[in-house]
Amino acid sequence: MSSAPRRPAKGADSFCTPEPESLGPGTPGFPEQEEDELHRTLGVERFEEILQEAGSRGGEEPGRSYGEEDFEYHRQSSHHIHHPLSTHLPPDARRRKTPQGPGRKPRRRPGASPTGETPTIEEGEEDEDEASEAEGARALTQPSPVSTPSSVQFFLQEDDSADRKAERTSPSSPAPLPHQEATPRASKGAQAGTQVEEAEAEAVAVASGTAGGDDGGASGRPLPKAQPGHRSYNLQERRRIGSMTGAEQALLPRVPTDEIEAQTLATADLDLMKSHRFEDVPGVRRHLVRKNAKGSTQSGREGREPGPTPRARPRAPHKPHEVFVELNELLLDKNQEPQWRETARWIKFEEDVEEETERWGKPHVASLSFRSLLELRRTLAHGAVLLDLDQQTLPGVAHQVVEQMVISDQIKAEDRANVLRALLLKHSHPSDEKDFSFPRNISAGSLGSLLGHHHGQGAESDPHVTEPLMGGVPETRLEVERERELPPPAPPAGITRSKSKHELKLLEKIPENAEATVVLVGCVEFLSRPTMAFVRLREAVELDAVLEVPVPVRFLFLLLGPSSANMDYHEIGRSISTLMSDKQFHEAAYLADEREDLLTAINAFLDCSVVLPPSEVQGEELLRSVAHFQRQMLKKREEQGRLLPTGAGLEPKSAQDKALLQMVEAAGAAEDDPLRRTGRPFGGLIRDVRRRYPHYLSDFRDALDPQCLAAVIFIYFAALSPAITFGGLLGEKTQDLIGVSELIMSTALQGVVFCLLGAQPLLVIGFSGPLLVFEEAFFSFCSSNHLEYLVGRVWIGFWLVFLALLMVALEGSFLVRFVSRFTQEIFAFLISLIFIYETFYKLVKIFQEHPLHGCSASNSSEVDGGENMTWAGARPTLGPGNRSLAGQSGQGKPRGQPNTALLSLVLMAGTFFIAFFLRKFKNSRFFPGRIRRVIGDFGVPIAILIMVLVDYSIEDTYTQKLSVPSGFSVTAPEKRGWVINPLGEKSPFPVWMMVASLLPAILVFILIFMETQITTLIISKKERMLQKGSGFHLDLLLIVAMGGICALFGLPWLAAATVRSVTHANALTVMSKAVAPGDKPKIQEVKEQRVTGLLVALLVGLSIVIGDLLRQIPLAVLFGIFLYMGVTSLNGIQFYERLHLLLMPPKHHPDVTYVKKVRTLRMHLFTALQLLCLALLWAVMSTAASLAFPFILILTVPLRMVVLTRIFTDREMKCLDANEAEPVFDEREGVDEYNEMPMPV
């Protein structure tokens, strides 16, 4: 050819080999070491050929051959793209686009198919790409004699990067040999075509045919091999001179070469060149086909094996689930056949199978050896880790695991069958022998017969089992992919069986949506060294006859090895099982992307573990510090978890996110706080109505549950017993002006109204000890000042309504927050002391009225005649059941009855001890839990019934009975009626007393306010998980207003009873059955409804008709219940416990916060101050000023806020005055509702 071809522009065709004339004689080649380093740095093969200048390639020989990697990279990159001939049309026939500027994103190529093949580029897309490239090609592709590195511009798409990265990890597949002549040429233009071919060969310095193969051998690259059935390919066909780079923008786009060369060629030659250079030849566009070889299914960068890796499906993000872990060991059965036997399981704590009895032991915290954890970490670091394995059956998983073990050189190829056989052995469980129905385990020996059950393919074989794992043919892989796309078949009816009782019981304890971890460890002698595999399945699947219960399996851990290895397989199995049951580790296992994530999670677990020294422990008390240290470690771990979210791959939250989260939490807390003040009159009351009344209809629908019926029966007796007890004592204190009938009617009426209108229907309103103390004090005040007691209560009721409206209007319920544990414990301790004192005071009074008689001879003349006459005259009148003296209302109480004092003592003590013992029996170990709870909850009614029967059976001894009228009547009809005249019954009530009644009204309001609001606070604790909310203002207004109105009818005012309300809430609490053995019970829901309280109030009101039965109850039995309430109220009072510490050496002090964080003398000082306040209250109660005791009690609030804060530090006050009481739902010995509240009964 006359004119020498011009050098191609570097930016236009980066893959053209430069002319040898442009290379210096001494230009060195690219060093092999630097090339390897650049491979590792850039991560893309042949990437340096794009980056380096043309002159730097002089080290390569001009005639070197190009392998299949060159072709693949050349085709898949954006540097050289063949376009169909239809794209080379005049500009007016094509839609032109703006050039690709730096501000525009490059057009994204279609992603590769899942099989790794490159999709065909559509013609329309090429038109757009060609038009966009044509605008910017003028400035970038102008031929220049010298090119600089800054002129190199290339674009590497994301798909290119992924494809090249996949190719880098796999060996290059054989490529076809180039034919001698690949492109058909017309005979008419053979000479011109040969000239063009020679010019191109001179420009690129590459010989075709055999010359390329020789040069290729010299360059050190393997000779490409032609694949059968594919057209051979020659690099010469992809070459064109540099002037053709911008041919699309030429004025004559149909001319395939430069102007000078085109003038020397005939038209046929030009057409041939057009066909060769512009057309999309199918043979050239054909994609490479390689021999199929299954790649490693291992996720992440760890342990990737060479081989073509098809592009996997994107992994769906794993959401951590609750976990169930089962440890199986390879042991011999009674027939000396190996099998997998379950030896332990973890739901939260470890449960081991006792070897001798084959029973499950008690749940306990797993204690691990430090060496086993180190061995586990080492095995995970060197073993096989397969993440997101896409298998549905145990045989498929086993084959993948075994092949991965062979690939990672853990086992020999000849051990493949033995390991596989070991993995597919049958599994046995301790519960199998208890089931006499269809056998649960299906033998895996006949594996072929199970394939149809697993896949529903009839007689077809399982590809996972019958085909080799590596090197399979493409057809098998396609069949497997089609099979995975099919929905999982339903279990065949032939092997379906009903779950056993043991399985159902265990499934109740496993959390919902839990996923299982199977741990398989054992000794096999055919292996020379241990082998390990950790598998996480892509989707959790149920593996037949593997687990004890049908729970889907997500993780598998396998450890096999010889007994000669210095490794305890059982301990390593326990270690990985304990790790998987740990919340932080199994969350990290779900989110792990590679092996390093698991190793990091193990290190985090070790950071929070406690190592005990190898010393002998003499007692459990020596291990108390271990539990304390462990709690500190867990607290630190939780704090770190809040700063850095757990799980692999998660970034820490930014400061903005933390601030936003705190604002949201603060806003939510402020919105849900019912004590927050609005600043408007009655604003809190309006918020209570808007919060609670929208749930009004659901309050009745939610009562349609059997548990509510059981709660009605239980709470009825729990409410009736105090009503009878306090009613009898109130009648004693007020000379029957207010007695049992008035208290029962008041409880019924106010209970019905409150359950219909109240904001928190779980509250049980009733009479309490503080109100009883006030009623006694006010009655004494009225008697000493010759005032009518019932009329004075009416005016107190009027002032109560006014005070309630004023408090609610000012949103004063927030003041309950200032009533701390310091005041509550003094109040509760005072009432308990009053209960205990009143019991023994009444008993002593009985002994004074009915003294004991000494034994004397019948003929003695020194016997007191008066007393004998009383005893002799009374004895004949006693009828069966000593009932004849019960109704002597007009004759007064009999005195000096024989054996009355002793029988009263027996009845009182018997009632107390029976009720107290049944309360303890509730949390004992006898009988099933349900029976114990029923007996314990009805302990007080059972004690009353037993002692009433004892009294009834003793016919000749008098005891004072409960005074209850017949029918619907007041206790003393001769003294009062149902309606009280506010102006006076027998004489006009003084006007000054109408106004002065404000003071006792304030005192009563203080008592009702404290009891009601503190009880509502206890019920509304967040640990109880109430959903409908409470209403402090609405409940206070209803209770106080109803008490004020009931005073017009001579009925006692009531308050929220703390113990009964907590008992009511506990009875309506549904505990979750999915509680791990050894774990605390968790609340599932609370039946928040109005029906149970409504029915209880109605039943208490109807109890007035059983007056005949109530009249059989001796007062001594009520004294026993009074003593029981006083003693049990002391439980849970920290003040009472600290009083014990005054008499106890410091070495015997309990391990509690206020002992460990506060010095002993400072703690005793705090106790002494509380004791001083208690003594002051008791002194006030013992004087004529006993009516003012609520005012003295409320003064302890400013005392704590002003005085104690100057004596004690904030840290000491938090330890001594913190409200640490939590709801009690479990069955710990000696712990019940009384331990939860420092409030009086």
From Swiss-Prot:
Keywords: Anion exchange, Antiport, Cell membrane, Glycoprotein, Ion transport, Lipoprotein, Membrane, Methylation, Osteopetrosis, Palmitate, Phosphoprotein, Transmembrane, Transmembrane helix, Transport. Residues 848-900 are extracellular. The chain crosses the membrane at residues 708-731, 737-774, 784-816, 826-847, 901-918, 934-954, 988-1010, 1036-1059, 1091-1136, 1163-1199. GO terms for biological process: amelogenesis; bicarbonate transport; digestive tract development; monoatomic anion transport; negative regulation of CD8-positive, alpha-beta T cell differentiation; negative regulation of CD8-positive, alpha-beta T cell proliferation; osteoclast differentiation; positive regulation of enamel mineralization. Residues 1-240, 288-320, 449-471 are annotated as: Disordered. Residues 1-707, 919-933 are cytoplasmic. A lipid is attached at residue 1173 (S-palmitoyl cysteine). Residues 210-219 have a biased composition (Gly residues). Glycans are attached at residues 859, 868, 882. GO terms for cellular component: apical plasma membrane; basolateral plasma membrane; focal adhesion; membrane; plasma membrane. This is Anion exchange protein 2. It comes from Homo sapiens (Human). The gene is SLC4A2.
